[in-house]
């Protein structure tokens, strides 16, 4: 059943956002600053903003951040409180510097591990700090109604998720948005063993250890000496040289990121997912299909709650957004790809209703468990679960660059290319120093003439085909080296003979690297035997994408994606400490015979499903 969202439905959100841009915080809110003592005596800075002249009790909406609760000082006010439109709804807003950051005392630990069992009454982690903060707020902030919500994006989303663990009874609603969850398995640091280089280096040049309390960042702007990231990182050499040449061994957070190349205890204790159980607050998880940092964490947080705390009210909203993009834009496009409407407005309306229902006892609004934007079709859809019911399908890599639903029979056995670490495949035609978020939808034509990228394509589709959920490449490969990466990109190839301005566009739908030495274990890497055929299988993050009639489904396979990921020297070694002589060309072979049927597996959404409805926003 198709349900149209008429213009009046969005009018409230559009007006709310317009009003938010004009809403004066200082005229409408009174600010008070506090130092809140934790159970171990460490005091955390919190700024409390309460509506002026409001006599009724109000709920508290908390945000915890490592990025500064500024502006500091009782007379200094931010431009916004909470998401757009929230300030007009009258909450008591609290913004807190987490332990060891900016104006809070204590030692900061990057992604501080959560403990299932505390060592004593003064033992702390992010869960206890949130509990102690909430306990103090409800007992000491005037005019609160005893109900607390928490909201945060990215690192703030991680803190919002942490609040769900051994949560305070007053915490009744939480919205982790683009939350980190497992840094090694697909979030900010590593994807299938490959290090996300440009995102982490640019982040940790500014995110440094502080001598707190401090009101401003102590990191001066980093001088790259060039605006060409490809050139800069190629000249950097092995990652261990980054400390010596650029950061002078002064940032332990960066060093920890690149040195722990396997899924060792450093990463395992920082994996939040096993701890998210027995959740009592209602949860609204929010994420973007084009989140280059924490798409994996968003989906896994939702799935962990549904699996490990099945009675918890847990909703998921996924839109066509980059990392946190719903917070600062309309959500109408990303790069060259337009989505047909201002998608972020739909989210803001849902957010407000969610918190008003649980914090202010507002009448419940009929909102689905999963509210998902289908890219390609540019439609919002609602479902009882994510992923929805779907039919498994495989596309097989075939000779001649073909991609087919039919498995190979007798045909040439493999395709091959030479991967050279001295000339890695770029992830964008030109890459500035910060990671380019638009790479998630970018046209892949710019690598079509490279001999180290192999493309496979279906015939034009005779009807629309929607892929929903995770994608699983299953490749049979060999290498002349002792280690190699195998990066897979799923692409929507637009017709070349249409009048569409994007005619011939090869839109990236999902891409993911895989470091070959981890094909059997992320804790015990294994060298390749040169020339030996090996099977590599891995999961790529979920998509919800409609390949339209007349489009082609394309797959590209390559062995570098630079400087999005660090270079694999193609010699089995500890990559951060690789020597220049370890970086060698390697011949990579992708096999597609009846004995070695390389393929990509995914779920196809049926055209009509019970409990699955299409919502067209106008």
Predicted regions and their residues:
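C-terminal, loop-rich substrate-recognition/catalytic regions characterized by aromatic stacking residues
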Residues: 224-226, 231-239, 326, 332-618
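Glycine-rich nucleophile elbow surrounding the catalytic serine of serine-hydrolase chemistry
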Residues: 152-162
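Alpha/beta-hydrolase fold nucleophile elbow
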Residues: 142-154
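N-terminal cap/lid segment of alpha/beta-hydrolase-fold proteins
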Residues: 21-56, 457-463, 528
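Conserved alpha/beta-hydrolase "acid-adjacent" motif
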Residues: 292-299
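Cap/lid segment of the alpha/beta-hydrolase catalytic domain
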Residues: 52-140, 189, 327-339, 450, ...
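Accessory cap/linker subdomain of secreted extracellular hydrolases
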Residues: 80, 88, 110-123, 127, ...
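Short beta-strand/loop motif that positions the catalytic acidic residue
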Residues: 279, 285-287
């Amino acid at each position: 059943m198709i349900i149209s969202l008429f213009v009046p439905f969005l009018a409230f959100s559009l007006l709310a956002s317009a009003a938010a841009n004009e809403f004066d915080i200082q005229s409408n809110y009174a600010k008070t600053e506090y130092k809140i003592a934790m159970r171990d005596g460490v005091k955390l800075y919190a700024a409390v903003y309460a509506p002026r002249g409001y006599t009724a009790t109000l709920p508290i909406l908390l945000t915890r951040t490592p990025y500064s609760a500024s502006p500091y000082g009782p007379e200094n006010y931010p431009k916004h409180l909470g998401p757009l439109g929230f300030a007009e709804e009258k909450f008591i807003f609290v913004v807190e510097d987490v332990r060891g950051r900016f104006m809070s005392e204590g030692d900061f630990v990057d992604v501080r591990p959560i403990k299932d069992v505390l060592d004593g009454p003064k033992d702390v982690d992010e869960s206890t700090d949130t509990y102690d903060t909430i306990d103090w707020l409800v007992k000491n902030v005037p005019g609160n109604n005893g109900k607390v919500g928490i909201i945060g994006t990215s690192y703030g989303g991680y803190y919002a998720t942490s609040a769900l663990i051994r949560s305070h009874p007053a915490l009744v609603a939480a919205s982790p948005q683009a939350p980190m969850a497992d840094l090694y398995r697909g979030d900010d640091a590593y994807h299938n063993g490959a290090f996300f280089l440009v995102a982490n280096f640019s982040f940790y040049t500014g995110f440094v250890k502080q001598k707190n309390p401090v009101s401003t960042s102590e990191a001066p702007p980093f001088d790259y000496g060039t605006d060409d990231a490809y050139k800069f990182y190629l000249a950097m050499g092995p990652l261990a040289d980054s400390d010596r040449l650029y950061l002078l061994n002064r940032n332990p957070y960066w060093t920890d990121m690149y040195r722990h190349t396997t899924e060792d205890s450093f990463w395992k204790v920082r994996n939040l997912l096993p701890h998210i159980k027995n959740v009592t607050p209602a949860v609204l998880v929010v994420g973007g299909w084009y989140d280059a940092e924490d798409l994996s964490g968003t989906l896994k947080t939702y799935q962990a709650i549904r699996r490990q705390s099945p009675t918890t009210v847990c909703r998921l909203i996924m839109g066509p957004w980059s990392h946190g993009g719903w917070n600062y834009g309309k959500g109408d496009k990303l790069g060259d790809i337009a989505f047909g409407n201002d998608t972020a407005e739909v989210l803001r309306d849902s957010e407000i209703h969610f918190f008003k229902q649980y914090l202010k006892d507002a009448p419940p609004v009929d909102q689905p468990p999963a509210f998902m934007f289908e890219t390609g079709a540019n439609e919002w859809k609602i479902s009882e679960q994510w992923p929805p019911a779907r039919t498994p399908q495989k596309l097989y890599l075939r000779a001649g660059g073909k991609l087919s639903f039919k498995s190979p029979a007798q045909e040439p056995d493999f395709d091959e290319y030479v991967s050279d670490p001295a000339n890695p495949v770029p992830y964008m035609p030109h890459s500035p120093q910060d990671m380019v978020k638009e790479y998630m939808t970018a046209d892949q034509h710019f690598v079509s003439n490279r001999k180290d990228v192999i493309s496979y394509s279906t015939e034009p589709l005779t009807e629309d085909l929607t892929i929903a959920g995770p994608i699983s490449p299953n490749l049979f490969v060999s290498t002349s080296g002792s280690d190699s990466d195998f990066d897979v990109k799923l692409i929507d190839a637009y017709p070349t003979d249409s009048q569409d301005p994007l005619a011939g566009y090869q839109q990236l739908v999902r891409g993911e690297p895989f470091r070959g030495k981890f094909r059997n274990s992320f804790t015990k890497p294994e060298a390749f035997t040169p020339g030996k055929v090996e099977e590599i299988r891995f999961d790529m993050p979920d998509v919800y994408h409609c390949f339209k009639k007349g489009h082609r489904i394309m797959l590209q396979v390559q062995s570098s994606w630079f400087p999005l990921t660090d270079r694999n020297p193609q010699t089995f070694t500890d990559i951060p400490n690789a020597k220049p002589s370890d970086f060698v060309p390697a011949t990579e072979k992708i096999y597609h015979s009846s004995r070695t049927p390389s393929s990509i597996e995914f779920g196809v959404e049926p055209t009509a499903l019970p409990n699955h409805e299409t919502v067209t926003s106008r």
